[in-house]
UniProtKB/Swiss-Prot annotation:
It is found in: Cytoplasm. This is Ribonuclease HIII. The gene is rnhC. NCBIfam families: rnhC. Keywords: Cytoplasm, Endonuclease, Hydrolase, Magnesium, Metal-binding, Nuclease. It comes from Streptococcus pneumoniae (strain 70585).
Amino acid sequence: MASITLTPSEKDIQAFLEHYQTSLAPSKNPYIRYFLKLPQATVSIYTSGKILLQGEGAEKYASFFGYQAVEQTSGQNLPLIGTDEVGNGSYFGGLAVVATFVTPDQHDFLRKLGVGDSKTLTDQKIRQITPILKEKIQHQALLLSPSKYNEVIGDRYNAVSVKVALHNQAIYLLLQKGVQPEKIVIDAFTSAKNYDKYLAQEANRFSNPISLEEKAEGKYLSVAVSSVIARDLFLENLENLGRELGYQLPSGAGTASDKVASQILQAYGMQGLSFCAKLHFKNTEKAKKRLER
């Protein structure tokens, strides 16, 4: 039976209780504040602030607090560089790529901090732990602004080759800082064949072999850290761009983005949209059609 112990913030505890309030059950243990019987798991919230999750579904419910089980592989126990990117699926905001160097002796610290794939963490949790990660973990962060993105896409780069360039540059710059990884892992966004093809046009190269692995953020803590820092960088950029234009820019590429894009287009024209959005997305044409109604 899986057993996970966490010490989340009181705010996260209250959010969890609100979400699963129908599963609250009585407990005779005087040290348990709240007890929940959930499908495939029980959750005990102690007066000390600790939470004990038990059962087959423990990991699922622990992910609410940012916990992610990291697969134990031989590669995990090596000094390792891992990279990930955030923003490639969002119409608004730039493209953030981060490379991180993590050694095995840092694993316990990272797990206690609650590091997992940024997709499983709330934005609030990401903003909370990123300053600590940036201070303690060697990394290299790059941000391609929307305006620069629009400048290079369709000219020298496409949506895939620009990510190859950024991942390569982040790793290259991190290696220049003197780190010595025994393995380099990229959270796969294309095939190894494609990656090598686009890499050939990059000037800055290194001899270290790389490995492209799907869902690497769940296998390697270095990739998970990169995912978190990249998400924070993307969110900060999204906020700053929106503040300059006077709009709250949504993440993603849904109808909310179409609506805000049409408003920006009406207020500032294509120049304003180019400042904050990736123009080759279909949202641009959808925003134009909204103005024609």
